[in-house]
């Protein structure tokens, strides 16, 4: 349950936004992020987080949204021209791209995504008993589809994003612990989570392949990866790298806001 909460936390951080001071950048981000697929996924993710007694859900449904939009807009504003940014938004707002996005989010929330997380249980048991978990086995997947999924992850700096998010999620460990937990127990929990995060970082591609296999097809991933051929791609990559590089600082602020 704790691991599923953390992944929901990571997935939801940039997906639901409120009204902020408008310009073409903030307007574009809100247009991109407030589609039906995102809204449905966010509702479930925030419901999970609000069940944690020590989490300040008021921050997540209030100031966080403004902070997130302004943070994202700032990086795009700094690294992309208005034309490039507008073209990027148009690419992601294409009906076929939105439909694929819905498939990806559905995979994360579906039984298939839960099965991917359930596959971690033996590894968690090994970590709890001081053992070394075995790496996950990749699912059966068309080689070309696998190549396109891995390329999609690379384009979006997914490994770096997940690493930064996991490091910040560690800051919630103490808040999530039940009352009466001793210092020794907390230390053991922290070590176990360190081990789990390291394991998940190493096996993240396999986890994502497991969740997406059967949910997306080759054409879906080729449609997403067509972004590489767009004139705005170079500035998009620059903005994306800037976001990832600053993510730890932003998530530290989010974690602080989430604490009651």
Predicted regions and their residues:
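Boundary at the C-terminal end of the N-terminal hydrophobic targeting segment
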Residues: 20-22
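Extracytoplasmic/secreted envelope proteins and their assembly/folding machinery
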Residues: 26-30, 46, 69, 73-77, ...
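A cross-kingdom marker for long, charged
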Residues: 194, 198-260
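Bacterial N-terminal signal peptides
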Residues: 8-16
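Bacterial N-terminal signal peptides that target proteins for export
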Residues: 1-7
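Surface-exposed, polar helix/loop patches in the mature regions of secreted/periplasmic/lumenal proteins
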Residues: 81-139, 215-245
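Extended amphipathic alpha-helical interaction segments
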Residues: 115-214
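N-terminal Sec/ER secretory leader and immediately downstream segment
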Residues: 24-116, 120-123
């Amino acid at each position: 349950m704790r691991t599923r909460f953390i992944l929901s936390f990571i997935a939801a951080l940039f997906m639901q936004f409120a009204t902020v001071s408008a310009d073409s950048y903030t307007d574009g981000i809100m247009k991109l992020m407030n589609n039906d697929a995102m809204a449905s996924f966010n509702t479930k993710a925030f419901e999970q987080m609000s069940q944690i007694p020590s989490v300040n859900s008021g921050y997540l449904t209030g100031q966080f949204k403004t902070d997130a939009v302004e943070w994202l807009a700032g990086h795009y504003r700094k690294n992309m021209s208005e034309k490039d940014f507008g073209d990027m938004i148009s690419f992601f707002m294409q009906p076929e791209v939105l439909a694929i996005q819905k498939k990806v989010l559905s995979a994360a929330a579906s039984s298939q995504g839960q099965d991917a997380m359930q596959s971690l249980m033996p590894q968690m048991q090994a970590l709890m008993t001081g053992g070394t978990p075995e790496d996950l086995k990749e699912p059966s997947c068309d080689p070309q589809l696998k190549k396109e999924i891995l390329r999609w992850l690379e384009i979006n700096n997914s490994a770096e994003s997940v690493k930064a998010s996991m490091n910040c999620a560690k800051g919630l460990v103490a808040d999530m612990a039940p009352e009466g937990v001793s210092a020794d127990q907390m230390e053991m929990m922290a070590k176990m989570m360190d081990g789990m995060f390291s394991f998940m970082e190493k096996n993240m591609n396999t986890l994502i392949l497991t969740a997406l296999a059967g949910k997306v097809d080759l054409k879906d991933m080729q449609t997403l990866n067509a972004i590489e051929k767009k004139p705005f791609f170079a500035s998009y990559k620059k903005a994306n790298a800037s976001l990832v590089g600053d993510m730890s600082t932003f998530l530290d602020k989010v974690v602080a806001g989430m604490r009651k």
